């Protein structure tokens, strides 16, 4: 039976309209996020940086204000330098550790994995823990079947082969063979 091509349940114009609506919504969300980020940035800066009032200050007061600002800038620069040094140290350490891992991978060969036969009891013990005593011997429910020895059922006649040829010749011999083939199944 040839495969039937599945037709889309939505027409191409409807797909295009939905796609344009989704893009418009995504653009709107992106613009809103951008505005929120800008507002958060302005709010953060207004909290951290107080407004400077330089009007009406004397020359000595302005110089003191400049010295304070320079001291703050120096402290911030020192902190920034310390953080950059720590980051650089950490990145170097990470790079060295990655190289060590690559070296160790090359030195050791992974052993070939072998299948391990786990019994159902061992699996349950591993899953449930050693406290739970659950036995799941699935072989106990199976019936025992004895193999029949086909060689024992048919006695092998060893005798003169000429007698067998004479006895089996003609229609009488065919009847004997047919009866012999039927007899083991009836017993």
Curated annotation (Swiss-Prot):
Enumerate the residue ranges of region (Involved in binding TNC): 2-48
Q: Where are the annotated segments for Involved in binding TNC and actin?
A: 97-118
GO terms under cellular component: troponin complex
Q: Which Pfam families match?
A: Troponin (PF00992)
Modification N-acetylproline, positions: 2
- Point out residues bearing the modification Phosphoserine: 58
The residues that cross the membrane are none
Disulfide links within the chain: none
Single Gene Ontology BP annotation: transition between fast and slow fiber
Q: From the UniProt record, which GO molecular function terms apply?
A: actin binding
Keywords for this protein: Acetylation, Actin-binding, Muscle protein, Phosphoprotein
Q: Which family does it belong to?
A: Belongs to the troponin I family.
- Could you tell me what this protein does? Troponin I is the inhibitory subunit of troponin, the thin filament regulatory complex which confers calcium-sensitivity to striated muscle actomyosin ATPase activity.
How the protein assembles, per its UniProt entry? Binds to actin and tropomyosin.
- Name this protein carries in UniProt: Troponin I, slow skeletal muscle
Organism lineage string:
Eukaryota, Metazoa, Chordata, Craniata, Vertebrata
């Amino acid at each position: 039976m040839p495969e039937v091509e599945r037709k889309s349940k939505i027409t191409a114009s409807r797909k295009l309209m939905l796609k344009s609506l989704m893009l418009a919504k995504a653009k709107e969300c992106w613009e809103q996020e951008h505005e929120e980020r800008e507002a958060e940035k302005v709010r953060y800066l207004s909290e951290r940086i107080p407004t400077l009032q330089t009007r009406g200050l004397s020359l000595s007061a302005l110089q003191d204000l400049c010295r304070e600002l320079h001291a703050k800038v120096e402290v911030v620069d020192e902190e920034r330098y310390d953080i950059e040094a720590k980051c650089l140290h950490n990145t170097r350490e990470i790079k060295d550790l990655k190289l060590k891992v690559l070296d160790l991978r090359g030195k050791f060969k992974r052993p070939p994995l072998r299948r391990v036969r786990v019994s159902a009891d061992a699996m349950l013990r591993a899953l449930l823990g050693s406290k739970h005593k659950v036995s799941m011997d699935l072989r106990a429910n199976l019936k025992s079947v004895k193999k029949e020895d086909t060689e024992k059922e048919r006695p092998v006649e060893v005798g003169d082969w000429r007698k067998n040829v004479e006895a089996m010749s003609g229609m009488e011999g065919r009847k004997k063979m047919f009866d012999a083939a039927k007899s083991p199944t009836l017993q």
